[in-house]
Amino acid sequence: QAGIEHGLRPRLHANQLTDGGALQLAAKFKCASADHATFASEADLAAAAESGTVLTLLPSIEFSTRQPYPDARRYFEAGVTVAIASDCNPGSGFSNSIPFCLAIAVRDMHFTVDQALWAATEGGAKALEREDVGHLRPGARADFSILDAPSYRYLVYRPGVQQIGAVFCEGELIASNPQPYSVFA
């Protein structure tokens, strides 16, 4: 409560293993984000959309815990802002690979490639309440990678293949692969 009184929006770990009512609590307190949101009723989704709470889905967690994957179509149809993250941790999430998470999101959670990429970039920025990252527009930080691939879609379809040709942070080149491994040559 003290944080809310000082302008901080809470974040909540919600409904990972069961529908425990945490998503309704997240909506009630207008949380910035509710992470996991694996088990969500239609009422939960409507409440999240109404409150502006971003639901952050964590595909690698369901992979590790063998929980059912949420159907992202339900979240989008309800008007929920969705983010994707890895939640890499030593207990239930063993991968920090965003391409792996994107591949699961597209293959098992009914995201389109474009929806998955948006959720992992701009959706994540919205969950963090950051307007300066997650997109390439005037005034943004310009943090991005250039892929060594024929299309951005390969990031999702080839998650185990090294595809990064260069990395930029705040518009400055910080890393490049002078001889990128290319399965496309």
Describe every region a protein language model picked out.
Residues Q1-G20:
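Metal-dependent enolase-superfamily TIM-barrel catalytic cores that perform enediolate-based chemistry
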Residues A2-I4, P70, S145:
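Short, electropositive alpha-helical surface patch
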Residues R9, D19-H135, P159, I174:
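Active-site-adjacent C-terminal substructures of enzyme catalytic domains
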Residues L12, I84-S86, A142, L147:
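Active-site flanking residues adjacent to catalytic metal/cofactor-binding acidic residues
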Residues A120, R141-A185:
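C-terminal cap of metal-dependent C-N hydrolases
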